[in-house]
């Protein structure tokens, strides 16, 4: 009975495979939205105010960071929790594949969230005249919470690695 339960639990990791594949579909949706934004801005590029263009560019950078985060979580999560990726030797392989454990993935995700939050906060500040002060305060508090969380996670990781 114990062996059956252990084998069933171990095999259940494959339930995550469609979830990671779903992230690739989310990446496709993000790419479509990215190019929709570019197609939307190109006809108006010469009549746009510089600040409006910068806001669009910040949105594109934001989407790019989210896309990178999706790729990192998709590949690293699959390799850490489901199965090793079998990439043929003659194909280009990302140099971090197979080297990122769950802790380093968590730290990279936290750093990505801080970067995404920074871009979002910059967009908010560029339009600060249209954002109520209490909302600005909450954006800053939430961003600082992300920064503090990432710092604490990195610090705790460093402590545990140093003690082992």
Swiss-Prot record:
Keyword line: Cell membrane, Membrane, Transmembrane, Transmembrane helix
InterPro entries xrefs: UPF0114, UPF0114_bac
Keyword RNA-binding: no
The organism's place on the tree of life at top rank: Bacteria
A GO cellular component annotation in the UniProt record: plasma membrane
Transmembrane annotation, as ranges: 15-35, 53-73, 136-156
Membrane topology label: Multi-pass membrane protein
Protein location: Cell membrane
Family of this protein: Belongs to the UPF0114 family.
HAMAP family named in the record: UPF0114
Name the UniProt record assigns to this protein: UPF0114 protein YqhA
Gene name, Swiss-Prot/TrEMBL: yqhA
